[in-house]
């Protein structure tokens, strides 16, 4: 019996022809594009350290189904700690000032001789206090609240890299479903669709949103750096914010939208002088959480996902400006970064928990 194997070298030649142009002309190693070598279907094959992408059973993202969520009273709202010495002093002074103003206002309101003050504050003392809190907490422009950051086009996505120094606050996540550990935000990743497409990674009842903002943090209580934490138990926490279309754009998203013009091509980067990452977060205490994985190679199943149950918004004209981002180098053929999301993974009977007691889903409105 005779076996003909002459087709095998031809297969190698064809495969080589497909791989080489990818690395030379596109100039990237892995991609969210399922139609190319290096796309999600190949993640678990091309690198031995990425085997979890193919065989893992706790993979992300997933579809969030509200009627299957498990209410868990032990899941507390997430706390955001951005405190350093200067910020502690600032907040201490602010609280003392608030107490002083409240006391003075109350005295003015109760003193009948001061009729004008009584008319102003007497019936509206609660509103006055709320107004002062709003001014001090949400409108105070304090340099210490800004972090050192860099906006970069990695070739697979655009990302904000957070830098740290003794004179700037660290951005930390704690409480919630994190078992008391403190996680430091290392970067903020942006997943999106093209002009007329939605590109969030997580979906709600099958609905995909235009964009998803992911604050990626590592456990500083257990691990010395992000790399070791990403491969270790309880190593990573990702705070996910879905972005929907609306009449107004979130203020920090406006800053980033303007900055995208400076990072159109792979490896381009720009410093963000006044970036405040916590302003990307909506005002909500409602969260959804589950144990999953990174959504990029090597898909390590070390992530506690925390999805906020309220979106932030972006105007369509601002969203379209993000479509001028390319995964190719400047001067090469323009290949858009978007869409850059991983497909939905199987839940595999995982518990998806929430602290929401009522059946009001802002995502579904």
Swiss-Prot record:
All residue ranges annotated as the Alpha-carbonic anhydrase domain in the record: 28-356
Subcellular compartments: Secreted
GO CC, one annotated term: extracellular region
GO molecular function, one term: hydro-lyase activity
Main location: secreted
Signal peptide (residue range): 1-25
Intrachain disulfide bonds: none
Keyword Secreted listed: yes
One Pfam family cited in the UniProt record for this chain: Carb_anhydrase
Active-site feature positions: 223
Database matches in SMART domains: Carb_anhydrase (SM01057)
Family the entry assigns: Belongs to the alpha-carbonic anhydrase family.
Protein name: Putative carbonic anhydrase-like protein 1
Source organism phylogeny: Eukaryota, Metazoa, Ecdysozoa, Nematoda, Chromadorea
Name of the gene encoding the protein in the UniProt record: cah-1
């Amino acid at each position: 019996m005779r076996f003909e194997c002459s087709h095998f070298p031809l297969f190698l030649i064809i495969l080589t022809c497909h791989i080489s142009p990818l690395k030379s002309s596109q100039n990237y190693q892995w991609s969210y594009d399922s139609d190319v070598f290096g796309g999600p279907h190949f993640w678990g094959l091309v690198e031995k350290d990425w085997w979890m992408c193919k065989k893992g059973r706790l993979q992300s993202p997933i579809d969030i189904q509200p009627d299957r969520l498990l209410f868990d009273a032990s899941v507390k709202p997430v706390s955001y700690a951005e405190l350093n010495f200067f910020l502690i002093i600032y907040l201490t002074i602010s609280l003392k000032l608030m107490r002083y103003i409240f006391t003075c206002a109350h005295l003015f309101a109760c003193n009948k001789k001061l009729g004008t003050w009584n008319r102003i504050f007497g019936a509206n003392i609660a509103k006055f206090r709320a107004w002062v809190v709003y001014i001090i907490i949400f409108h105070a422009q304090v340099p210490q609240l800004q972090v050192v950051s860099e906006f970069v086009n990695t070739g697979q996505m655009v990302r904000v890299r957070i830098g740290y120094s003794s004179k700037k606050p660290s951005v930390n996540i704690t409480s919630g479903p994190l078992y008391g550990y403190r996680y430091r935000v290392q970067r903020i990743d942006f997943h999106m669709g093209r002009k007329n497409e939605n590109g969030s990674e997580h979906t709600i009842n099958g609905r995909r949103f235009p964009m998803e903002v992911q604050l990626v943090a590592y456990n500083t209580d257990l691990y010395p750096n992000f790399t070791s934490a990403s491969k270790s138990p309880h190593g990573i926490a990702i705070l996910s914010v879905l972005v929907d279309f609306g009449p107004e754009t979130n203020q920090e998203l406006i800053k980033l939208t303007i900055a995208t013009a400076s990072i159109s091509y792979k490896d381009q980067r720009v410093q963000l002088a006044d970036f405040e990452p916590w302003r990307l977060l909506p005002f909500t205490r409602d969260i959804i959480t589950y144990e999953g994985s990174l959504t990029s190679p090597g898909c390590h199943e070390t992530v506690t996902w925390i999805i906020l149950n309220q979106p932030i918004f972006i105007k369509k004209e601002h969203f379209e400006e993000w479509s001028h981002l390319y995964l190719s180098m400047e001067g090469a053929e323009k290949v858009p970064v978007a869409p850059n999301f991983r497909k939905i993974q199987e839940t595999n009977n995982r518990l998806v928990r929430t602290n929401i007691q009522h059946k009001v889903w802002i995502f579904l409105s």
